[in-house]
Every structure is written in C-alpha cells, then in structure tokens.
C-alpha cells in the first residue's frame, strides 16, 4: 500500500531521531497516525489514495529513524558490515535506503534475497524443528508447559 502513496503528503514525526542513543520507539509516530486518521474523519471515511499516502508517510518517518540510527551505531561501534535480516528485510524501501546509506558511508552491506525474507517466528520455528530432528528423544513436545508471560530471571 505504501508503494502507491505520497510519502510527503502527511509530515509525521520521526521519534527519537535526534536522541544520542540507538534506541527506537515508534509510540509517538503511532499516536500521530491515530490523531491524523481521527482528524480526517475516521478510517472508514478515507479513500484508497489517502490510505496509501498515510502508509507511505508512516513508512517514510519510521525508516528515517531506522536507517539513521543503524548507520550511526555502525560508525560508533566501528562495524564493517551491516546486515539486514528478519521480517523487516522484506520491506523494499528499507532494503533500498539502507543499502544506499551503507554504501555512501563506506560499509559493506548484505541482505537476503527477497524470497528468503521471512518473519522471525518462522525462523525460530524452523530452528526448533531442526533441533528436534537432531535429538528426537528430547521429550514429548506436546507436553511442554508454555508460559507466554515468563519473566527473565537473573
């Protein structure tokens, strides 16, 4: 949808772009989208072009932070190669912009072929499958006790 939109139509904030750390938070951007849609009369009142323009504007603001902070972190930690991976690597504009920024700054850059971009959950599931295949007598996986709210322990 964002590919069909005008990324400049709705100027949106790029949260934490100028913070000195390398953290990300898109809560301000999400709130800006919420208010924008509300001010335009609600989602059901938006035509397809406006939806595409909002998506493109959101993508533009989000990627600006992601690309900028990635390059700054690579410089700061003296990284030689930037690797784009995980589900986010399927975003065509991110692939283009991060590759260009890395080249301009003199970093080696790598990303998977588009057909290999996938959600992190799929990668974790595949790793679990291979681990189970390597050691099938590791127990009955159907009797696992799963706690989705398990906290981290020291």
Where are the regions that the model predicts?
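Conserved phosphate-binding/catalytic loops in two-lobed NTP-binding clefts
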Residues: 82, 99-124
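Active-site metal-binding loops of divalent metal-dependent hydrolases
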Residues: 87-88, 114
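A contiguous, well-structured pocket-lining segment that forms one wall/lid of small-molecule binding clefts
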Residues: 1-82, 91-105, 132-135, 154
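Glycine-rich phosphate-binding/hydrolytic loop that grips phosphoryl groups
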Residues: 112-153
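Short, conserved alpha-helical segments within structured domains
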Residues: 50, 90, 117-121
């Amino acid at each position: 949808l964002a590919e069909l939109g005008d990324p400049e139509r709705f100027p949106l904030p790029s949260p934490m772009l100028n913070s000195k750390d390398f953290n990300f938070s898109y809560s301000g951007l999400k709130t800006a989208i919420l208010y924008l849609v509300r001010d335009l009369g609600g989602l059901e009142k938006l035509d397809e072009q406006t939806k595409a323009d909002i998506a493109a504007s959101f993508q533009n603001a989000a990627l600006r932070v992601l690309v900028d902070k990635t390059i700054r972190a690579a410089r700061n930690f003296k990284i030689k190669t930037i690797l784009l991976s995980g589900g986010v690597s399927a975003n065509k504009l991110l692939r283009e912009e991060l590759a260009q920024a890395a080249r301009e700054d003199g970093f080696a850059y790598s990303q998977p072929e588009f057909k290999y971009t996938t959600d992190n959950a799929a990668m974790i599931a595949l790793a679990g499958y291979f681990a189970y295949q390597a050691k099938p007598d590791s127990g009955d996986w159907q009797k696992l006790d799963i706690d989705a709210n398990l906290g981290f322990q020291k």
